From Swiss-Prot:
The keyword ATP-binding does not apply. It is found in: Virion tegument. One of its GO terms (cellular component) is viral tegument. It comes from Human herpesvirus 6A (strain GS). Pfam families: Herpes_U30. GO terms for biological process: virion assembly. It comes from the Viruses. Coiled coil: none annotated. This is Capsid assembly protein UL37 homolog. The lineage of its organism: Viruses, Duplodnaviria, Heunggongvirae, Peploviricota, Herviviricetes.
Length: 798
């Protein structure tokens, strides 16, 4: 909690002084709000209070420092991550971290930083901490990656948990990405993930769980919640990053339950924090925020549900919690105090004014209307009144409804007026498209008519006025807006049904046009950019993989012969010589092809992920649209659903075709890669590393077994015209692997030897080229291959 003020005899630390100042400011704001509570419906005062609270939120974020979120048990890496977090998102209050960050790195003597970093790859998860990695290597908290440097990146696998506190895991976005994209967790790391899940459960229970009594949170409690979220690495920006990561993640049936638990808990925490920060950014104890909150919740619900329809239950928990935290309303006791001394007409006006501004009825208001007894109204028949109402509706005059005022006290007037005038007008309005509604004046005419003739129907008038205000003020339609408008229109219909004791359903054209407009905006803002980015990335990946497959297929068509005199490889297709390369270059090429094959196996999984994500988006759109059952009879909506279904079917067919062709490529490539792995193993059996890691004797014995083993192979029959097709790929492949530094330059290098031991020299190095006619050399041993093998191996056998 935010600390209370220190005792009078306690000078206090910098922290306690800061917290006491925050508490003092909060108390002043609470006092100001309470003193002006009776003016809570005066727009001028409310706007000042609203602006004050929003400035307070901004100010509070700008006094947050690294020291506020530091735990006593933080590791060295924890402190570095938190310094980067505070300086990145709250730089104005954390300028002192520039020097502290550098000193922390300079003064560390017990931590080997090499353990933190990965030098083997460039996977998406590593890129989340790329700038942070540069900051560590440069010891500069202000460093920015401009693509000018190459440096190791912070590890993202579970081994980094050896250096990272469980409660600080959300400061490491790359690690979260890594865990989400795993199907199983190594057994030795399950305990670590269990601890993380327990920590998430604690956060949900202590920070997020809805209280038993849904009382609004105080300002101190709300600011304290901001503080707690920041202590675990969550703010508005990081929540958006995690939502993006989660939206691109799709669990599979074979995912380990412990990972599913992790995903569910993370989703609950991140989405709750995200909605909390949006509400907090707009919060004030006023009707302005009350109306904002309804729209915020509808917008976020629409976005969350369309991403994943299975989040419906989760959203109920999130919205209940947010409603509880930000429970701003009016009480009847406040209204009585507010209207003390006013007459009945004044109270009626103030009640109506409260209702119009808050958009809700928190308590009923009963009053009597005194009207002069109009003999004309009571002496006409119901049939005559029906004809009068019909004539007024059919009139071209916009003020024709005023002629009905003398009949408004007739016992049957309300029912007849609603049936003959209001219902046709509402049907006309809801049958318009949204564009036409903005230029049509009938809704405004209907509002004036009902205000004159049905003054006691506050809710009906409010919803009509809300619909009109929306039609003239909205500049952007989204799914949250559609949900609110749909609710308003059907509430108008419900009030009509109550007044007429009938079942009335509005037309669907207006809602469908708004819905299609909202989905069009959604597709343009979220789906289209994602598709464009994904297609570009996938297309580039597939093109590269096709080139790789062509190289593999070209090598499959070749025959390689080794010249033992100079260790050169002659590569041929049939009788045509294609290329000549050194043995070292040949082996390096083999290793490179095997490495590329393994990298492609990982990177091609992104295509499967993108398929799952895109089809999920389209499926959720269809499900979400179809959930509006009242609109399904609309022809335009049916066409939209059919279009999305056709797109979804086309996407499935396209991805299936891609998957089939990629599988064929993989099958072809696997044949070559298995052969290359055997070649590499034969070469590596006597390599420096193999001898160093085992022993010379064991390696020689293994080499002897390989020498006598029978490795048969089949030469493919290649058509003559295929040579021209394969040759460019083979030539390009081996040309790129030619060494750029000569052996002489390597030997003459002035660089000092930095290894701790004398290395076993590579037996295939150029310095070990076989000497021709070795038997002519003085004192050299010369024998046939079989005899030499026996002489070498016999002493090693035991």
């Amino acid at each position: 909690k935010l600390r209370a003020q220190p005792a009078a005899n306690d000078p206090g630390t910098d922290k306690t002084i800061k917290y006491s100042k925050i508490q003092s400011i909060i108390q002043k704001i609470n006092s100001f709000t309470h003193e002006n509570s009776l003016l809570a419906n005066c727009r001028a005062v409310v706007e000042l209070i609203d602006d004050l609270y929003r400035k307070l939120y901004s100010w509070f974020l700008h006094v947050l420092t690294f020291e506020d979120i530091q735990f006593p048990g933080d590791t060295f890496l924890d402190r570095l991550l938190k310094m980067d977090y505070c300086f990145t998102y709250y730089p104005s209050s954390n300028r002192h971290l520039i020097d502290l960050f550098e000193k922390t790195l300079d003064n560390q003597t017990f931590t080997n930083l090499d353990k933190f970093f990965d030098t083997s790859g460039n996977s998406p998860e590593l890129l989340y901490q790329k700038t942070f990695s540069l900051k560590i290597f440069s010891k500069n908290l202000t460093a920015q990656d401009n693509g000018l440097y190459i440096y190791p990146l912070l590890k993202t696998d579970l081994s980094i948990l050896d250096f990272l506190g469980t409660e600080n895991i959300l400061f490491h976005r790359g690690l979260i990405y890594h865990i989400l994209h795993q199907k199983t967790i190594p057994q030795e790391r399950e305990n670590d993930l269990n601890k993380i899940n327990q920590f998430f459960a604690t956060v949900i229970q202590q920070v997020i769980e809805t209280k038993s009594s849904c009382l609004p949170a105080s300002l101190s409690q709300l600011l304290d919640t901001i503080f707690h979220f920041n202590r675990i690495g969550l703010n508005m920006e990081t929540c958006r990053t995690y939502i993006e990561i989660l939206s691109n993640h799709m669990a599979t049936p074979d995912t380990q339950p412990i990972i599913n638990t992790f995903t569910i808990n993370l989703t609950h925490i991140v989405f709750t924090a995200h909605v909390f920060f949006i509400c907090m950014e707009n919060f004030s104890p006023t009707f302005i925020f009350y109306n904002r909150k309804k729209l915020i919740l509808e917008q976020q619900r629409a976005i969350l549900i369309i991403e994943r329809n299975d989040y419906s239950t989760l959203w109920k928990q999130i919205s209940d919690h947010i409603d509880c935290l930000f429970n701003v309303s009016l009480s009847e006791s406040f209204f009585k105090e507010y209207t003390k001394g006013g007459n009945e007409d004044q109270k009626q006006f103030l009640y109506k004014n409260l209702f119009e501004k808050w958009g809700n009825v928190f308590f009923p208001f009963t009053y009597s209307v005194s009207t002069s007894n109009n003999s004309t109204a009571h002496h006409i028949t119901t049939l005559e009144l029906r004809d009068i109402c019909k004539e007024v509706y059919q009139s071209d005059s916009p003020d024709a409804y005023e002629s009905l005022l003398p009949y408004s006290t007739h016992p049957s007037f309300k029912t007849l007026y609603v049936k003959i005038y209001v219902i046709p007008m509402v049907s006309h309005i809801t049958n318009l498209t949204f564009d036409k509604l903005q230029s049509d004046c009938r809704l405004l005419t209907l509002i004036h008519a009902c205000k004159l003739l049905l003054p006691s129907q506050h809710l009906l008038l409010h919803y009509m006025a809300w619909l009109y205000a929306f039609s003239i003020n909205v500049d952007h339609i989204d799914l949250g807006t559609f949900t609110v408008i749909k609710s308003v229109i059907f509430k108008i219909a419900d009030h009509i049904n109550v007044m007429t004791h009938t079942i009335y359903s509005p037309e669907t054209n207006l809602l469908v046009s708004i819905l299609l407009n909202a989905y069009t905006n959604y597709l343009q803002k979220y789906v289209n950019p994602w598709i464009k980015q994904t297609i570009t990335a996938n297309f580039s990946l597939i093109q590269t993989y096709i080139t790789f497959t062509k190289q593999c297929a070209s090598i499959l068509a070749t025959k390689c012969n080794i010249n033992l005199d100079n260790l050169f490889i002659y590569i041929t297709i049939g009788t045509d010589k294609i290329v000549t390369t050194s043995f070292c270059s040949f082996i390096a090429t083999c290793r490179n092809l095997v490495r590329q094959h393994e990298e492609f196996e990982k990177s091609l999984q992104t295509i499967q992920i993108s398929e799952t994500t895109l089809t999920g988006m389209l499926r959720n759109i269809i499900t979400s649209v179809s959930s509006s059952k009242e609109l399904l009879t609309n022809e335009a909506l049916q066409k939209f659903i059919d279009t999305v279904q056709r797109i979804s079917q086309h996407v499935n067919e396209t991805y299936q075709s891609i998957s089939m062709n990629l599988e064929k490529c993989k099958t072809s490539n696997d044949i070559l890669i298995e052969s290359l792995k055997k070649i590499i193993y034969i070469v590596d059996v006597l390599s420096s590393n193999a001898i160093l890691n085992t022993s010379l004797a064991s390696r020689c014995l293994e080499a002897a077994n390989l020498a006598v083993s029978n490795n048969s192979f089949t030469i493919l029959e290649i058509k003559k015209d295929a040579v021209a097709v394969f040759k460019p790929f083979i030539t390009q492949l081996f040309e790129s692997m030619k060494p750029t530094t000569s052996l002489h330059k390597k030997l003459m290098s002035t660089q000092k030897l930095t290894t701790d031991h004398i290395p076993f020299l590579d037996t295939f190095d150029d310095r070990y080229n076989l000497v021709r006619h070795v038997e002519r050399q003085l004192n050299w041993y010369a024998a046939h291959a079989e005899a030499a093998q026996q002489d070498l191996i016999t002493p090693l056998k035991f």
